[in-house]
Amino acid sequence: MHLQGKPPSHCPVNADWLKRAWLCCMLLLMTACAAPQPLMLMPAPVLYRDGLVDPFAHLLPARRIPRMSIFYATNREPEITEQGLSYGNDIAQRLHLGQAVVQLGDENTQWNDLYEASITDQTGLLLPLKLHSVAQQARFPVGMAVPSAELTDEAQAYFAAINAELAEAQDREILVYVHGTKVDFLNSAALTAEIDHFSGRDYVGLAFAWPSHQNIFRYLIREDVHRAQASSDALATLLELLAEHTDAQRINVLAYSAGARVTSKALDQLRTKYSDESAYRLKSRLRIGTVIFAAADVELETFLDRLGSISDLSEQVVITVSDDDNALIAARHYMGGGSRTGEELAESAEEFFIHEHQITNIEIIDVSAGKLARGFDISGHHYWYRHPWISSDMVFLLRTGLRPDRRGLAFSELEGIWYLSDDYPEQVQRAAKKEMRGSW
């Protein structure tokens, strides 16, 4: 008998096993010693700098406050903390639905402070993010989508609240944000609020929070990989519920990192479930608009197996790739499975798939292309919202759903692949002024 995870004494010690074991030990040490980092407001997109585009000019005075109300759906079990209701790491068998309020800044932050931090270089203006309140409104069995007449009173109230906000929004659209690994419920709610805020508070934000742990070791040993995969049923249920019971014209999805595992599988499941329907009819019924895979941590082969289904269900599919995403490089080296969808290494295979299947609604944004002309790369794992150039494209895309040539992106030599040129700030500001006609 030998200990689990240790090579038996009669077998030669495998160098790859030793490397992974060493990494596990180092990650355990780092996660045990590292203090949780406070969440801070993302840098202002370059799109808004210089005052050429004001995303908040249209807001009524009542909405100019340093708080954001969002909706949420989670298959985390609820827990009571010192701050009140929240959701922990235990897996729930039901979908918990509710609303949360996120504070952008501290108790002394005024709207003018938040406004300044949202449209300028934030040196000295970093603002913390925290949950102000959480209110659960309903629970729903995973795997069921029922007619409105059969909804509980609580569920009807939840969808009625979404519809009330849709009626007041400039865009009658919902953004479902699916977070990555190593984060908690607060993180998923806060990032949803940030994205909604920086997009001009023009649609309804909804956080889908799956039960990831708050350390990378659980992901490395694939426990949270399995949790991500197992959460696809809950996300598929949510998307059907939103299509059935809300007035949203479009339901957009932003999947980040391991959230792409949840999202790609959920969309593939929905296509399989309704395989007898044409893509046109299903797309019209589910009303899934733009689906973004940002820094996606999904094995390329798995993702390509699902990409046809994703295309069938969505109006527009956007994949971001980088040549210097430290998290995806580490995942490829230490977890196996080959290139990740969000790596530049996967770009040629993705481009070939798109061309081979004659797909016209998928675009790839290579954030590393053009780096020599720009004088810098767009790197790291959080680049899609932390770097002010690519975050500009994300908020512009979510606000408008425009094609890349109308968002200020440059066309590469490869079909379907776009990048940010050295004059991107001027290009995106010019595009926004033209497309929005002076009004965000």
Question: What residues fall within each predicted segment?
Answer:
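C-terminal motif of bacterial Sec signal peptides marking the signal peptidase cleavage site
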Residues: 31-32
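Short substrate-entry loop that stabilizes the transition state in hydrolases
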Residues: 184-186
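Bacterial N-terminal signal peptides that target proteins for export
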Residues: 3-22
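The conserved beta1-alpha1 loop
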Residues: 176-180
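Alpha/beta-hydrolase fold active-site loops
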Residues: 173
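Hydrolases whose catalytic domains are alpha/beta-hydrolase-1, hotdog thioesterase
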Residues: 262-266
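Gly/Ala-rich beta-loop-alpha elbow adjacent to hydrolase catalytic centers
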Residues: 255, 259
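Lipolytic serine-hydrolase domain surface
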Residues: 39-149, 166-168, 189-193, 197-205, ...
